[in-house]
Amino acid sequence: MAKKRIAVIGAGASGLTCIKCCLEEGLEPVCFERSGDIGGLWRFQEAPEEGRASIYQSVVINTSKEMMCFSDYPIPDHYPNYMHNSQVLEYFRMYAKEFDLLKYIQFKTTVCSVKKQPDFSTSGQWQVVTECEGKQQVDVFDGVLVCTGHHTDAHLPLESFPGIEKFKGKYFHSRDYKNPVEFTGKRVIVIGIGNSGGDLAVEISHTAKQVFLSTRRGAWILNRVGKHGYPIDLLLSSRIMYYLSRICGPSLKNNYMEKQMNQRFDHEMFGLKPKHRALSQHPTVNDDLPNRIIAGLVKVKGNVKEFTETAAVFEDGSREDGIDVVIFATGYSFAFPFLEDSVKVVKNKVSLYKKVFPPNLEKPTLAIIGLIQPLGAIMPISELQGRWATQVFKGLKKLPSQSEMMAEINKAREEMAKRYVDSQRHTIQGDYIDTMEEIADLVGVRPNILPLVFTDPRLALRLLLGPCTPVQYRLQGPGKWAGARKTILTTEDRVRKPLMTRVVERDSSGGSLVTVRVLMLAVAFFAVILAYF
C-alpha cells in the first residue's frame, strides 16, 4: 500500500517537527516554504518579509532551553539557558540535520490554495496549488498540516489613535524595528507592553533621549531569572505546582504569582500595576525594564488619547511634546487565505478542536499546528500536536463527533473569556502543562507516575517535583526514546553547565530545582490525596 502523502505548510519550528512526525508514522511529507531557508520567526533578516513576523537583532528567547527543546533532541549543554535568536536558529538547523529533514522541503514555494478534492467526503484528499519561480503546480495530498504560526500579519490599529495621520514624526509597527542606532538623541513613544514593547523600550532607552512606554492596562512583569538564579519557567512548570494550583484555585494562584513578581519591585509604585489579576493576561517577560524605569530612561504612561503634529496627549490629560518617533508594538493577527472556507478566522478567533482540528470537515485530514499562545514554550506543544495529528491521519486515533467537538470548543472559549481580559492576543491562550498533558493523553504518552514510585522512585520524584520538560513525553508509548530517563535526571547539569565558566567551590546550602520545601509540599499533597481517597 502506497504511503499517504502529507503537505506541510511552513518550515519554521512547527513545520520541521511535523516533517519528523510524519516520518515517524510512516507518512510521506512534502513541506512548502515560501522563503529560501528554515526557521520561520526565528530567522533574523534586515528587511522584513510580508506575511512573516520579523524579529530584531538582539532578541533573546523568553523560554529556557530545557523547556523549549524538542522532546527527543536536547539542546547542547553548553548553550545558554536563554538563547539568542541566532542560537535558536542554529538548534533548528542541528535538528533538521540530525533527522535528515531538509530533503523534504521545497523552498521558495508559495502555497496559493488548498481545496477539497471533489470526492473529499470519501477520500479526505486535498488539492494543493503551489507557485515557484512564477510556475504553478497542482498536487493531491492525503492530509495537510498548516504550520504558518500566528505572527503572520502585523496588527496596526491606527484607527484607535486619532491624529496619527497629522503626526509629522516617524511611526511604524515593531516588526520593522531592527536596532536602536537610528533613535539616538530622540524622544520615542512605544505603544504596547507585551514582550516586544518591553524589549524595545529597554533597548532604545540606551540611545534615545527619552522613551515613553504607553500601556492601556499595565502589566505584570516576569523575570527570566528566578530563585537561586534558575530559569523561572523551570521553577513554575512542575507537576506538583500544577496539582496544587488546581486544588487551591485561581485566587491563591494569582496571589502567589503577584507576590513573586512584586518581590523584585512594587508594580504599583512603578506605574505598571494593572486592575486585572496576574493570570488574566499573558505576562510580560523582561529582566531590565524596572532598571530603566528607576533610572528615568523609560517613563510609563497611560493610553494615548490623540496625537498632534509633534505631541502625544494621554488619557489622563498629560502631554508629551517634541515626540520624534512612535513605535506600535501592538502584536500580530493571523489568517489562512489559502484555505478559503475550510478554516474561518473572525476577530482573531478560530474554531478548532483542542486548538488543532476544524470540527466541520467530513474527514479529519487537515490540522493547524502551533496556533497557540502558551504560558510557556510553543515548540514542544507543536511537536505533540504534530504527533497527535499524524496519528489521526493514519487512522490510529479517532476524533469525537462534530457536535461533541463544537461543545468542547464553546466551553473552552467561555472559560478563556472568563479568565482573560478582552484582547486580541488572548484568543489563542493556553497553559503549558494543561495543554501538554491533554494532548499527551490523546497520543498515549503521558507519564504514569504511580507505578514509577515503586519501580523507579528517583525518576518518579523528578517527574512530580522537577520541571515538566518535553522529554518526559518520550518515556513511554508511541515514539518512546531510550535516552529520555537519563535526560530527565541530568536536567540540572545542563542548566548549570553554561553558567560555570569560572571554577568556584560548590556551596552545599545553595539552591536546587528540587528543594526540601518542595519535597515537603509533595508529601503533604499525597497525604491529602490519601485522606480523600
Swiss-Prot record:
UniProt-listed GO biological process terms: lipid metabolic process; regulation of cholesterol metabolic process; xenobiotic metabolic process
Phosphotyrosine found at: 56
Record-level GO cellular component terms: cytosol; endoplasmic reticulum membrane
EC number per UniProt: 1.14.13.8, 1.6.3.1
Main location: membrane
Pfam families (UniProt xref): FMO-like (PF00743)
InterPro entries: FAD/NAD-bd_sf (IPR036188), Flavin_mOase (IPR000960), Flavin_mOase-like (IPR020946), Flavin_mOase_5 (IPR002257), FMO-like (IPR050346)
Subcellular location, record wording: Microsome membrane; Endoplasmic reticulum membrane
Transmembrane segments: 513-533
Modified residue annotations for Phosphoserine: 54, 58, 280, 401
Induction comment from the UniProt entry of this chain: In the gastrointestinal tract, expression is induced in response to a high-fat diet.
Biological role: Acts as a Baeyer-Villiger monooxygenase on a broad range of substrates. Catalyzes the insertion of an oxygen atom into a carbon-carbon bond adjacent to a carbonyl, which converts ketones to esters. Active on diverse carbonyl compounds, whereas soft nucleophiles are mostly non- or poorly reactive. In contrast with other forms of FMO it is non- or poorly active on 'classical' substrates such as drugs, pesticides, and dietary components containing soft nucleophilic heteroatoms. Able to oxidize drug molecules bearing a carbonyl group on an aliphatic chain, such as nabumetone and pentoxifylline.
Family statement drawn from the similarity comment of this UniProt entry: Belongs to the FMO family.
This protein's name: Flavin-containing monooxygenase 5
Taxonomic source organism: Mus musculus
This protein's encoding gene: Fmo5
